[in-house]
Amino acid sequence: MTNANTQLQSILGQFAGRPDVTPDQEAQLRTTILADSSLLQKLNQAAASGHLKGFEPGVGGSEPLTGSYDKASGIVTLPAFEPGSAPTTNLRGSLRLQEMSIRFANSSYVDANQQRQHVTQDMVTNLQSTINSSPTLAKEINRAVTTAIDSRDPKSPMLLENFAPLSGTVAGGTFNPATKTMSIPPGTVGQTQSRFNKFYANDLTFVLGHETQHAFNQTSMTSSYRQFDAAVTAIAKDNDPVNDYTLPIENLIKSAREDEAKAQISGWNALVDRVRQTNPAVDLNAMSRIGTSRVEDFVEVNPANPTQIQARPGITFSHDGSLPMTPQNISAQAAYYFDKPPKGTPGLSALQTTGIGFHGDSDYPNYYGAGAVSRAIAFDRAYAHPVSGVAPQMQLDMQRLRFEEELLEHNGITLPPGTTATPQIYWDTSTNPPTRGLLQHTQGTHQHISPIPDIDPRQPVHSPPERAEHPNNELLEKIRSGVRGLDQQAGKSWDESSDRLSASLLLMATEKGFTAKDDLKFAFNTPTEKLAGGEILHMWREGHHSPDPAAHRAHMTTQEALAVPADQRLAQMEVMQQTKAQEIMQAQQQGPCKHNQHKLGRCDYASDHESN
């Protein structure tokens, strides 16, 4: 069990010695920290680095809802304590938020001029004051930072784990489910406090509520990605050379559409509660005057009485002005928000369009579409095959999907590693006959190249791909259990590196012929004169008797194991298994393999198929 380090022990001791702190309050703080091993580890690091130097109670009656952090002094001001000395969920959430704020405060970012800048105290203060200004927002963020992705796994990350400055795209904010990170534009939070409160606070309140809901939606979006992966894989593998990915892409975009609509509703609820703190009688008329255009997705002028504001058709507010998450409200908000056409659409004002993405010129279908199409291309290149001598042909109904080739590329088409120099040909079936199109890998350029597309491969930040279900699930779960053990030994929680290690070990285990029934062991190397500790990842199985001990052991460098994303490593394994199956069939038809050397149980001849 991890204990508080010397620095954190000193900080807790100083807190206990304050005249304005009761024994119950000191005990509640200490036990809340010690009850959350991940929080304890992070606070140990903050204290050891000198970024955390003390805790102090808030001023009675005016404590910040979730606490606050002062970068210069390193002091965290705590929210109001609950009665008793036992750990509390509210204090745990506040401490997690403050630990995130400490890391945010001491981070840096690259500005629009490609210059590295440090996060300022104004950025921290404006972010935290926004959270503390809306009880609804404070409650939801507190819930997000204390809700585990997998409640059965004590090492599971929370739904939200990081704040970061946003760069590289036009957006009010983003949430990345791969890293559990909410990113905020420095230009918004970097204002002086007086200017921020006057011009930016309401908008950021909405944005934080919106992005927090994305954190809650990530589980359902992960399921949507798995369904997408299964559907496009089936299309690519079937015996029809025409691979039309329109339907699975459409279904994935529909999931993103619902995700965004729910996030909008949460943004409204955070904002109306902020306004309610200074105007308890807030109504739609008051909301229309608070100085943010975001409310126009929810309300409109009453045509019969232009002095009054009413809900837009299909939207039904509660008596207190909040917006319930009903199917009707979700559907209406999806139409008013997600379905807006892209910026620059003739005849429409800026408020009637959407301008997001790297260039700020994209609508939502193309923003999410870039990632969906990139993902489909990856599976197509891994599994598509000629049928009766006919080469595979990728098809998309661009009009049905509301896609524009140029906007897809502006948002970023990513071609699989090792194949980026080969553009992806597709056929647009919305025309008769279908029109040939070309998508190029344009990472870093974000430019459309005539006559065919070219752009940077930014995956949609709100919903990056998750790992698909895999046929060798039982073996994979055994390996993941072993990797959890390695993580625990290293004092770290599960993260993307853990996924990469697991997928690499699965590929290596499959090549060696290991199965889920084997007693598998895992370890990193210990330090030697030539190697530092942890440079080599070992795997072996016990209980097998063989004259060849090497048959039961395998290893690879940790660098190699971490080099490839889990999805790509799993795709490599499936291709390897397909190749092996084909070789076995050929061997059965042609007789024994005549090659002198065998590798990992299969004939060791070269293949020109590159898996990704």
Where are these regions (language model features)?
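Non-Sec secretion/translocation targeting segments of pathogen effectors
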Residues: 1-3, 263, 590-612
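Auxiliary, metal-adjacent structural segments of Zn-dependent hydrolase domains
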Residues: 22-72, 80-82, 105-184
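Second-shell loop/turn segments in exported
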Residues: 193-198, 202, 249-257
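Active-site recognition of the HExxH zinc-binding catalytic motif
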Residues: 202-219
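Post-HEXXH active-site segment of zinc metalloproteases
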Residues: 218-256
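Metalloprotease/metallohydrolase-associated module, dominated by Zn2+-dependent proteases
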Residues: 243-310
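Pan-zinc metallopeptidase signature
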Residues: 295-461
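Extended non-globular interaction regions in eukaryotic gene-expression and organellar proteins
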Residues: 399, 460-548, 565-585
